[in-house]
Structures are given as C-alpha cells and as structure tokens.
Amino acid sequence: MQKVSVRMMAAMLAIVLAGSVAAAQPVRAAIPSALPGVAFTPGTTPIDLIDDRGRPVRLAAPARRIISLLPSLTEIICALDACERLVGVDRFSNWPPQVDRLPRLGGLEDALVERIVALKPDLVLAAASARVVDRLEALRIPVLALEPKTLEGTGRVITTVAAAIGDPVAGAAQWRAISTRIEAAARRVPASMRGQRVYFEVSSAPHAAGAGSFVGDVLALLGMANIVPASMGVFPRLNPEHVVRAQPQLIIGSEAALRDMPKRPGWAALSALRERRTCAFAPAAYDVLVRPGPRLGEAADLLADC
C-alpha cells in the first residue's frame, strides 16, 4: 500500500459517516450553479465582487497588474491563462514554473508592503487571514481576500478571480474541467478502498484535514471515511490520542511526516503504520493535495491511486 512518489499526491479522507457519500456521487452537486460573489457581464465595467470577508470590491476595469500572496491564488491566475498579469507573488508560490522569475513579497505574516506598493498593482489577491489586507486597503490598493476551505468554496474563488480579470466564462470552464476529472477519479477507485477510515496529516502538530475541508470533500467523493469529523473543524489540531483511538486503516501525509510518525508516543501501535498501509508524498506532490486550486482534479487522481 505504501507509495512514495511525486506522481502520487494522496490524501484519503472523507466523511466519518460511511456510505453517506457514494463514490459515484456526481461532483457537479458541489459546483456553484452561478457565479456567487460576482456582478459582472463580460465587456462591461465596473466589476463588482464580494470577497471572503463578505466585503464588496469594485474594480474600474479588469485587473492587469496583479500580486498574489497565496500559492493557490497564484495557481488559479495562471490556470486562467493570465500568468503574464502577475507582477509579484508570495515566497511559497512555486507553480507553474514561470512564476519563479517574479519578485517575492513575503508571506501571510510578513508581506513586504513597501515593495508591493512600488510594483503599482491594480489588484492584490490575498488570504482573508493575511495581516497585510487592512494596511493595503488603507493605501487604497484593491484587495480581494479569498481563502477557500471547501470544494464548493474553491469553485467560487476560481469564478471570482476569473471575473476580476474580465473572463468569468473561463472560470466556469476551469471549474467544470476540475469537477469532470474528480468524477472520473471517483469512478475508478477500487471497491476495496471505499469506506476505509483515513487519516490525512497536514502538519506534525498534528493538524489534520477534516471532513469539512476541500481535502475531505474530495475524499468523500472518492468514497473514503475520514477519522476527523467536520465538527472538529476544517484543519484542526488533534490530540495525538485521537488518532491512536481511531485506528485509521490508511494514513496519508508527507514523506517527512510518515518517517516521523512511528516515533510518536503510542503511534507505533497503529496497525496502518506497522503494516505499511500508508501513502507518503514528496513535497511537490503534497503541494497539489493541500492547495485549493486548479490542480484539485490532479489531486483526486493521486488519491484514487493511493
């Protein structure tokens, strides 16, 4: 069961209620039927948007000089064929490769405000939790604060970003392509994998991907059962004893995390570790799994192959 490969980004988790989501359930149910947060007709201005804080954002014209301060948002821009509009990114954005040449502008907690201002962006994309958002808005720089946590939220963010660049139709097409790929992955999950109890580790604290996260949503559609119920939060920090008591049948995480797990108190007793029923992923593959963006279809493929 153990697979260690950049080609296989896995994350098998889903809803604790076994059978509540069948592997064949259409992903389309999770796709927004309209463009929530968007009030825009192609070719018209201004563009009125609603961000993840519930705040209105008005753009006088489609954004042309964009700064992205979150890797998933960087990936969305490029998947919409607008990579050339990026003038700067956060330090963690590393896909697609062409973003490597762009100026690095810090991260969630330490964005470089002076450098951002000097680049004269007409739009900054940032996480809703980023400390820099209020400061940039005080400087009259338009900010879309977007931080999807669910599969449906990812679709909403993709369509909102597409509207911000003046091409909402491309956003809808991108989301349809993602959902189609997830559906295809769900159809080929082996029967032996469906319903398995899965633990997906996000960090060694340990933090896990809960059933209510975008990771959990994808895993539910693949027919997996998450040992971390939605009631515990999206990416909750767990008492390590929770994992030991839950006795997951499959454990998924980064290569580094899987190497460390047997050393944790009580974890050597986990049958999944003893029997190597694990999926460990190299950094590049793991990025695909934990970023709510255009590569979620690829993530579903990797999960189906775990």
Residue spans of the language-model regions?
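Bacterial Sec-exported substrate-binding components of ABC uptake systems
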Residues: 2-5, 13-72, 167-199, 305-306
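A short, structured surface patch at a secondary-structure boundary
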Residues: 46, 50, 64-119, 123-129, ...
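Extracytoplasmic substrate-binding proteins
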Residues: 56, 123, 131-207, 228-230, ...
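Stable alpha-helical elements in mature extracytoplasmic
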Residues: 62, 69-76, 82, 112, ...
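Short secondary-structure boundary segments
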Residues: 70, 128-129, 202-204, 231, ...
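Alpha-helical, coiled-coil/dimerization segments enriched in small aliphatic residues
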Residues: 92-95, 209-235
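Short helices/loops that flank or line small-molecule/ion binding pockets
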Residues: 113-121, 138-139, 237-247
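A ligand-binding cleft/hinge motif common to bilobed small-molecule-binding domains
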Residues: 130-138, 250-270
